[in-house]
């Protein structure tokens, strides 16, 4: 299923524990809790531009092609190289320290990230 669209966070699971695992400061974790982050995805075949826009103007954008190595930036600001794959309709990022999947389920963007044995799930509703 095509990923293109603009999505707003609707629900999160295990936010605090995951953000602590990323070694984010407690004040940043508290400040970001319940923010309405907008994810904008542009898909052109195997090419993706995946942006997250935070209130206050901060954003992160990752551009990648399925099957090719790229640089990925996490919500914690860390950067690493990974080869993004498409597996069963899911976008999959796998590295030694980070695992992330994203898929469209009932029109919603469902993302699951795991770091150091801690899993975080975010569900976003489609805006456009």
Curated annotation (Swiss-Prot):
GO MF: fatty acid binding
User: Per its UniProt record, what Gene3D superfamilies does this chain match?
Assistant: 2.40.128.20
Tell me yes or no: is Transport among this UniProt entry's keywords: yes
What InterPro entries does UniProt report for this protein, alphabetically? Calycin (IPR012674), Fatty_acid-bd (IPR000463), ILBP (IPR031259)
Q: Name one GO cellular component term.
A: membrane
Mention one GO biological process in which this protein takes part, according to its record: fatty acid transport
Give the subcellular location: Cytoplasm; Membrane
Signal peptide from the UniProt entry:
none
Q: What is its main location?
A: cytoplasm
Question: Which of UniProt's keywords are assigned here?
Answer: Acetylation, Cytoplasm, Lipid transport, Lipid-binding, Membrane, Transport
Tissue distribution is: Found exclusively in the ileum and to a lesser extent in distal jejunum.
Membrane topology field? Peripheral membrane protein
Residues found modified as N-acetylalanine? 2
- Role description: Binds to bile acids and is involved in enterohepatic bile acid metabolism. Required for efficient apical to basolateral transport of conjugated bile acids in ileal enterocytes. Stimulates gastric acid and pepsinogen secretion.
The text of the family note is:
Belongs to the calycin superfamily. Fatty-acid binding protein (FABP) family.
Q: What is known of its domains?
A: Forms a beta-barrel structure that accommodates the hydrophobic ligand in its interior. Can bind at least two ligands per molecule, however, the stoichiometry is debated.
Q: What is this protein called?
A: Gastrotropin
Q: Which organism is it from?
A: Sus scrofa (Pig)
């Amino acid at each position: 299923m095509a990923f293109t669209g603009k999505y707003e966070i609707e629900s999160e699971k295990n936010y605090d524990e995951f953000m602590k695992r990323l070694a984010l400061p407690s004040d940043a974790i508290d400040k970001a809790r319940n923010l309405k982050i907008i994810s904008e995805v542009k898909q052109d075949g195997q090419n993706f531009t995946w942006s997250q826009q935070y209130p206050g103007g901060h954003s992160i954008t990752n551009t990648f092609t399925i099957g090719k190595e790229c640089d990925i930036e996490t919500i914690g600001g860390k950067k690493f190289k990974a080869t993004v794959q498409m597996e069963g309709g899911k976008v999959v990022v796998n590295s030694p320290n980070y695992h992330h999947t994203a898929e469209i389920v009932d029109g919603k963007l469902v993302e699951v990230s795991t770091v150091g044995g801690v899993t975080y799930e975010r569900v976003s509703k489609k805006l456009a």
